């Protein structure tokens, strides 16, 4: 996912300069959500959202000189990782004016392009306004409403969980003084190397500016952790996908050994970059999701995800990830697989094994722990809400046919109705900049507590 500007300040004064200078104060937009109890009683929680540090203005500690401009570091302020962390400070965010982020009650709206800014990624904050809200997903369910009607081919409105540190990495890394309050500490299963700071140090050493993304590049380090994609979607296609890693906590990786999207060898790292995805279209049910389909993406929909454990406890082994939709007052079960050799309408260990075999995919999911590995990470996850475009494969893996050179009629290749490269970033950024996604009515609680479950 694409980011803009990040700080892990090395001195207390760095963050103080940001807070006390003539720059923008950091005020988190409020966002309420509901915590539910068995039986369906839900209590409003007063939360907020924080913008990921990678989007923020990074400037000299004692002034306003850019440490990072476009996709290039300032050679004087950032000659190496350590010096850059000492010399550069993080600024607060004008959420609406600069980033197109607005909240109203329990609703969060993200605009794709606002001025020079492209996309955004935010995290739900705890009520202390200093740390990320964490969730134990085991034996619980997570529900939210989404309006993806304005997201065309090539855009992705994503709701997902990652194993970030709740404090943004402050306790582990003494040079990180900004912390969760400024959106630090991101990681995911791609072991992203486009992050400008990781583990309290800059990522300038080995940095290569992107040829296609005017704001991004790839550095010498990446940041890895398990990722549970609840909802990756536009108006054409949607998928939910667990991505396990060998470690349940955030770790830093080196160069191409990171694997994932940003490295020459995709499967070289300690995480599963592919995951075990359930995309109804890819599973042969082409009439399930989209405009005027069974789940009608032209209208808001409630998305329910349940994390079933083998023994029915909050510490049990993850055995199944179930999906329901609620729209027009009706509960809609997830689409059933229509692929030969693959049965079911939920993610289980058997489903994942059968799917990889049917599609001829390497079972990287199993190599990194499979469903059990994902379950091992679910006891403390941070909620991420974003909108982004894809400079690596134009989102074809979500809404078109992918791999691009594969036979589109072969099992697992077609993922949606978008034409190849309909989602090229240059095209969507110029033609669909006003696209928005709205997430609202977030609920979390025991199985069956956040919606009227079918008998």
UniProtKB/Swiss-Prot annotation:
This is Probable 1,4-beta-D-glucan cellobiohydrolase A. The biological conversion of cellulose to glucose generally requires three types of hydrolytic enzymes: (1) Endoglucanases which cut internal beta-1,4-glucosidic bonds; (2) Exocellobiohydrolases that cut the disaccharide cellobiose from the non-reducing end of the cellulose polymer chain; (3) Beta-1,4-glucosidases which hydrolyze the cellobiose and other short cello-oligosaccharides to glucose. Coiled coil: none annotated. One of its GO terms (molecular function) is cellulose 1,4-beta-cellobiosidase activity. Its EC number is 3.2.1.91. GO terms for biological process: cellulose catabolic process. The active site is at 227 (nucleophile), 232 (proton donor). Glycans are attached at residues 81, 285. PANTHER family: 1,4-BETA-D-GLUCAN CELLOBIOHYDROLASE A-RELATED, 1,4-BETA-D-GLUCAN CELLOBIOHYDROLASE B. Pfam families: Glyco_hydro_7. It catalyses: Hydrolysis of (1->4)-beta-D-glucosidic linkages in cellulose and cellotetraose, releasing cellobiose from the non-reducing ends of the chains. The gene is cbhA. It comes from Aspergillus oryzae (strain ATCC 42149 / RIB 40) (Yellow koji mold). GO terms for cellular component: extracellular region. The keyword Signal applies. It is found in: Secreted. It comes from the Eukaryota. Belongs to the glycosyl hydrolase 7 (cellulase C) family. It is an enzyme of class 3 (hydrolase). Keywords: Carbohydrate metabolism, Cellulose degradation, Glycoprotein, Glycosidase, Hydrolase, Polysaccharide degradation, Secreted, Signal. The keyword Hydrolase applies. InterPro entries: ConA-like_dom_sf, Glyco_hydro_7, Glyco_hydro_7_sf. Residues 1-17 form the signal peptide.
């Amino acid at each position: 996912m694409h980011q803009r500007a990040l700080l892990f300040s090395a001195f207390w004064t760095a963050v103080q300069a940001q807070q006390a200078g003539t720059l923008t104060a950091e005020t988190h937009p409020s966002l309420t959500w509901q915590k539910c109890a068995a039986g369906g009683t839900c209590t409003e929680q007063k939360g907020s959202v924080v913008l990921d540090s990678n989007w923020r203005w990074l400037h000299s500690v004692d002034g306003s000189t850019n440490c990072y401009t476009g996709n290039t570091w300032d050679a004087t302020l950032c000659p190496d990782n350590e010096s850059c962390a000492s010399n550069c400070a993080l600024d607060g965010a004008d959420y609406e004016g600069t980033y197109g982020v607005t909240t109203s009650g329990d609703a969060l709206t993200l605009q794709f392009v606002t001025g020079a800014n492209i996309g955004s990624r935010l995290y739900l904050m705890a009520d202390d306004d200093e740390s990320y809200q964490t969730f134990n997903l085991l034996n619980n369910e997570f529900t939210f409403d989404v309006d993806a009607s304005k997201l065309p081919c090539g855009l992705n409105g994503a709701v997902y969980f990652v194993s970030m540190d709740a404090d943004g990495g402050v306790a582990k890394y003494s040079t990180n003084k900004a912390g969760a309050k400024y959106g630090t500490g991101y990681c995911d299963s791609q072991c992203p190397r486009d992050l400008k700071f990781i583990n309290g140090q800059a990522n300038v050493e080995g940095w290569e500016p992107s040829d296609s993304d005017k704001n991004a590049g790839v550095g010498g380090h990446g940041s890895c952790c398990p990722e549970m994609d609840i909802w990756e979607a536009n108006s054409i296609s949607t998928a939910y996908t667990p991505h396990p890693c060998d470690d349940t906590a955030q770790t830093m990786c080196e160069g191409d050994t990171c694997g994932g999207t940003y490295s020459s060898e995709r499967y070289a790292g300690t995480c599963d970059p592919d995951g075990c995805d359930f995309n109804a279209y890819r599973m042969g049910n082409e009439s399930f999701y989209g405009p005027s389909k069974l789940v009608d993406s032209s209208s808001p929909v409630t998305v329910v995800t349940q994390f079933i454990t083998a023994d029915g406890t909050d510490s049990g082994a993850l055995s199944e990830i179930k999906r329901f939709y609620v729209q027009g007052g009706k509960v809609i079960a997830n689409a059933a697989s229509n692929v030969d050799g693959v049965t079911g309408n939920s993610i289980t260990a058997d489903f994942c094994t059968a799917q990889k075999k049917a599609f001829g995919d390497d079972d990287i999911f199993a190599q990194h722990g499979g469903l059990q590995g994902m379950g091992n990470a679910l006891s403390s996850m941070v909620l991420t809400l974003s909108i982004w475009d894809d400079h690596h494969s134009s989102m074809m893996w979500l809404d078109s046919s992918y791999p691009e050179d594969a036979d589109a009629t072969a099992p697992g290749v077609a993922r949606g109705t978008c034409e190849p490269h309909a989602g090229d970033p240059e095209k969507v950024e110029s033609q669909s900049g006003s696209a928005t996604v709205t997430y609202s009515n977030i609920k979390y609680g025991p199985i069956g507590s956040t919606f009227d479950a079918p008998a």
